[in-house]
A protein has these predicted regions:
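Hydrophobic positions on the alpha1 helix immediately C-terminal to the Walker A/P-loop
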Residues: 48-51
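Walker A/P-loop NTP-binding motif
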Residues: 53-57
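Inter-motif core of Ras-like GTPase G domains
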Residues: 140-153
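Membrane-proximal helix-turn-helix segments that form the acceptor-binding/catalytic region
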Residues: 170-177
Length: 177
């Protein structure tokens, strides 16, 4: 249902140009996120993210997380300090994004939903699960993440990334190394 919305660009061209323009028009909410932690890789990301979130919360730290995909409900993607965003808040944020009039991908829009709302929480840590194409992933908009955690990388995304070797997949997934 969300993917059929007229806001979204139907052809996916990976890159950061659209989301960076949106963030600029929104007055850079990503710059308000403290202690950004990126969890990068192909498998084990959710377990790593969830474990880290649990450890930080056990130390009485306020944490936000952004995961993809959601398993049962879109709200699972947006954890904001001990609670998930409501459907009403997600819809209201998408309406705010619509006003920018930028043809975004669904993932870019959902990343913006996270960033906009996380920027208002003032959490001590903001943990983002990053996708298969890290270098051009819409979560890759923070200039200086506190930590970048790399989980398992394998041949799972060879065809999706149009790569022939595991070394090429590693360059895309972990472009900072």
């Amino acid at each position: 249902q969300l993917a059929n919305h007229n806001l979204f660009n139907k052809s996916v061209k990976f890159g950061l140009k659209r989301i960076k323009l949106a963030l600029k028009l929104l007055d850079h909410p990503e710059k308000k996120l403290k202690n950004v932690i990126s969890v990068i890789g192909e498998s084990g990301k959710f377990t790593t993210l969830f474990s880290l979130r649990s450890f930080l919360e056990a130390s009485n730290q306020k944490v936000t997380t952004h995961v993809s995909p959601s398993l049962r409900d879109i709200r699972e993607r947006f954890y904001m300090g001990k609670k998930y965003l409501t459907h009403k808040k997600i819809r209201a944020t998408i309406k705010q994004i619509e006003k920018l009039n930028i043809p975004l991908t669904v993932f870019e829009c959902l990343t913006l939903v996270y960033i906009i709302n996380a920027s208002k929480i003032n959490a001590e840590y903001n943990i983002q699960e990053t996708g298969a194409l890290w270098r051009l992933d819409s979560n890759n908009v923070n200039d200086f993440p506190l930590i970048q955690i790399c989980t398992n990388i394998n041949k799972q995304h060879l065809n999706f990334l149009k790569r022939k070797t595991l070394d090429e997949v590693i360059q895309e997934d972990v472009g900072f190394m």
